[in-house]
């Protein structure tokens, strides 16, 4: 099958590698332009560009695609059977949707119609889901609203973070993509419309999503901590400074939301619905990560201290 592959992040790399390994003819890889990165702000390739070059595939990096006649002519000349889109990061214009006979095939990291949007892995964990998965779908003009082709489930382990779950879903999605293309090529797959009434959203994460609300239950806070690791993390304030929680667990204790209590070497903080957290690893603004016992010894929090948003 003649393909064009559009993708940018690390999540998309296994999909590119798998379709090449399956023998598909990837004529072009489309990825976002090189971006400044690191202290020196030197230009860095996207993970997909690195992978494409390692596979000796041609790469293009248009700044825009919607009204880009040169790019349109380039794709038209290739005449792909399908265009594969995995985390490309740009809205696919209608001309591109209409170009290939088999359509634009997307790998989305959720069990659609749940968690449509840019951060499905993070929000599935943050909302306490025990199972998630991947969906292959045909792209239409909406946001992850196209007809579904195949789905595969994956359990979310209690200790999973978005950082640990993403590589497993990327591999599962790559395998599902190869199966989807084989079935499309053989004409033995039927696209199924989504039940739009059951959709939920997974919007792009903002820094403020990491702000801890201690009126949530301990389990809700833990779910969000796991989902928002590594970014934006889970943070609050202590004595007017930023205070990041990296590891914690729910415990049986009755404290007011945000109230701190020391029990031996254990540091507890109250949460909502008569629940509490034991903080295991924390980080103060401008400092290194530390075990809670080191924080207790160094800062000696007392009954007057609380964790929470600064008052205005």
From Swiss-Prot:
Cited InterPro entries: Fmt, Formyl_trans_C, Formyl_transf_N, Formyl_transf_N_sf, Formyl_transferase-like_C_sf, Met-tRNA-FMT_C, Met-tRNA-FMT_N
CDD domains to which the protein is assigned, alphabetical: FMT_core_Met-tRNA-FMT_N, Met_tRNA_FMT_C
Catalytic activity, reaction form: L-methionyl-tRNA(fMet) + (6R)-10-formyltetrahydrofolate = N-formyl-L-methionyl-tRNA(fMet) + (6S)-5,6,7,8-tetrahydrofolate + H(+)
Gene3D superfamilies assigned to the protein according to its UniProt record, in alphabetical order: 3.40.50.12230
Gene Ontology CC entries for this record: cytosol
GO molecular function: methionyl-tRNA formyltransferase activity
Keywords of this entry: Protein biosynthesis, Transferase
Domain of life: Bacteria
EC numbers for this chain: 2.1.2.9
Coiled-coil portions: none
Annotated positions binding (6S)-5,6,7,8-tetrahydrofolate: 110-113
Enzyme class, first EC level, given as a word: transferase
Pfam family, one: Formyl_trans_C
NCBIfam families named among the record's database cross-references: fmt
PANTHER family: METHIONYL-TRNA FORMYLTRANSFERASE (PTHR11138), METHIONYL-TRNA FORMYLTRANSFERASE, MITOCHONDRIAL (PTHR11138:SF5)
Function: Attaches a formyl group to the free amino group of methionyl-tRNA(fMet). The formyl group appears to play a dual role in the initiator identity of N-formylmethionyl-tRNA by promoting its recognition by IF2 and preventing the misappropriation of this tRNA by the elongation apparatus.
Protein name: Methionyl-tRNA formyltransferase
Species the sequence originates in: Koribacter versatilis (strain Ellin345)
Encoding gene (name): fmt
């Amino acid at each position: 099958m003649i393909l064009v592959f559009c993708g940018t992040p690390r999540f998309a790399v296994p999909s590119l590698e798998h379709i090449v390994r399956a023998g598909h003819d990837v004529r072009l890889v489309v990825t976002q332009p090189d971006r400044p990165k690191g202290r020196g702000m030197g230009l860095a390739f996207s993970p997909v560009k690195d992978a494409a070059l390692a596979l000796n595939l041609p790469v293009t990096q248009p700044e825009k695609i919607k009204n880009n006649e040169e790019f349109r002519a380039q794709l038209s000349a290739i005449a792909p059977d399908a265009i594969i889109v995995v985390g490309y990061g740009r809205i696919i214009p209608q001309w591109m949707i209409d170009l290939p006979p088999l359509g634009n095939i997307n790998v989305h990291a959720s069990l659609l119609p749940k968690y449509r949007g840019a951060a499905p892995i993070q929000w599935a964990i943050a909302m306490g889901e025990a199972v998630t998965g991947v969906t292959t779908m045909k792209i239409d003009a909406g946001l992850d609203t196209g007809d579904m082709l195949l789905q595969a489930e994956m359990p979310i382990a209690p200790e999973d973070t978005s950082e640990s779950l993403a590589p497993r879903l990327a591999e599962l999605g790559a395998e599902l993509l190869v199966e989807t293309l084989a079935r499309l090529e053989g004409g033995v797959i039927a696209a199924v419309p989504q039940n739009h009434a059951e959709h939920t959203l997974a919007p792009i994460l903002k820094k403020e999503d990491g702000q801890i609300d201690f009126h949530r239950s301990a389990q809700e806070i833990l779910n969000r901590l796991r989902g928002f690791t590594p970014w934006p993390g889970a943070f609050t304030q202590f004595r007017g400074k930023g205070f990041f929680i990296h590891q914690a667990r729910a415990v049986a204790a009755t404290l007011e939301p945000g109230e701190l209590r020391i029990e031996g070497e254990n540091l507890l903080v109250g949460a909502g619905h008569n629940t509490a957290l034991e903080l295991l690893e924390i980080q103060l603004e401008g400092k290194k990560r530390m075990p809670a016992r080191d924080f207790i010894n160094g800062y000696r929090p007392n009954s007057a201290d609380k964790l929470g948003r600064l008052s205005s």
